[in-house]
């Protein structure tokens, strides 16, 4: 018989840098999960990813206080900022342009995000990432 699910906890945690301080500690503490056990498991799973990159994680907490977790790919906006070499997006994306990004870079990001995106093909996913780039004030070059 399957374990009874008590809760799903969604967090964004920096890769390889999970520790019991907020947001991890309070979110898992109120579910009764062993926080250090999660931190060690998460850090071990994300040690191959660039340190500090925010990684979305969905933690399934069971009634017996055990847990499993699934890591996702970093948010598209974070990958776009990294590729364009900018600190933040534009405050007024229609008026201000903060950087440029090539179509090849967009396709590379779409390939990275392919596991988490529900697109029909890589072109559709690339267009989705392109929309995110434009909304951040990035100019897409061919």
From Swiss-Prot:
- Keyword Protein biosynthesis in annotation: no
What interactions and quaternary structure are annotated? Part of the ribosomal stalk of the 50S ribosomal subunit. Interacts with L10 and the large rRNA to form the base of the stalk. L10 forms an elongated spine to which L12 dimers bind in a sequential fashion forming a multimeric L10(L12)X complex.
* GO CC list: cytosolic large ribosomal subunit
SUPFAM superfamilies in alphabetical order: Ribosomal L11/L12e N-terminal domain, Ribosomal protein L11, C-terminal domain
The highest taxon in the source lineage is: Bacteria
Q: Which GO BP annotation is one of this protein's?
A: translation
What keywords is this UniProt entry annotated with? Answer: Methylation, Ribonucleoprotein, Ribosomal protein, RNA-binding, rRNA-binding
Q: Which organism is the protein's source? A: Shigella boydii serotype 4 (strain Sb227)
- Outline what the protein does: Forms part of the ribosomal stalk which helps the ribosome interact with GTP-bound translation factors.
Task: Identify a single GO molecular function assigned to this protein.
Answer: large ribosomal subunit rRNA binding
| Name by which UniProt lists this protein | Large ribosomal subunit protein uL11
Q: Which family does it belong to?
A: Belongs to the universal ribosomal protein uL11 family.
Spell out the post-translational modification annotation for this entry. Answer: One or more lysine residues are methylated.
């Amino acid at each position: 018989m399957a374990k009874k699910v008590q809760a799903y906890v969604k967090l964004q945690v920096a890769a390889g840098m999970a520790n019991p301080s907020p947001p991890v500690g309070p979110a898992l503490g109120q579910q009764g999960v062993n926080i250090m056990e999660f931190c060690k498991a998460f850090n071990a799973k994300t040690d191959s990813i660039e340190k500090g990159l925010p990684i979305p994680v969905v933690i399934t907490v069971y009634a017996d206080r055990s847990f499993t977790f699934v890591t996702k790919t970093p948010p598209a906006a974070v990958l776009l900022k990294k590729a364009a070499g900018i600190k933040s997006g534009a405050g007024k994306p229609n008026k201000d342009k903060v950087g440029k990004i090539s179509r090849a870079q967009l396709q590379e990001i779409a390939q990275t995000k392919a596991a988490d995106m529900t697109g029909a093909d890589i072109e559709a996913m690339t267009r989705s990432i392109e929309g995110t780039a434009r909304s951040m004030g990035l100019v897409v070059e061919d």
